[in-house]
Amino acid sequence: MKQLIVLIACVIQGEAGGLGEIGMFMVADTMAYRYETSQNWDDVLKYYYGYNSEPSDFATSLATRLVTDPWKSFFQCPFAYSDQDRYTQKWPVGNYTYKSLHLKQSWPGK
């Protein structure tokens, strides 16, 4: 379980560490939503990058909660993407946006 927590914390940090605690929570919330539907962390994590980041204490606390006592997703969005992805892929603005992070309830591609 500890290894899984560290892995998830690395991903949270890598995906949104530059956006601070709010951004990290939003990415973790997409993981919570995906876990609600799959109940399998391998299925959840295959959609994320950022595995090589050193996790912060906050990312680790989010990961610990996701593994030991997952919350019901607040945003109900399985997709998270950046402004850069939005521009290069010509995707729409997300249902929820924070700084350069977009959360979307449906696949943003065509």
PLM region descriptions:
Residues 4-110:
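Bacterial extracytoplasmic/cell-wall-associated proteins, especially those involved in peptidoglycan
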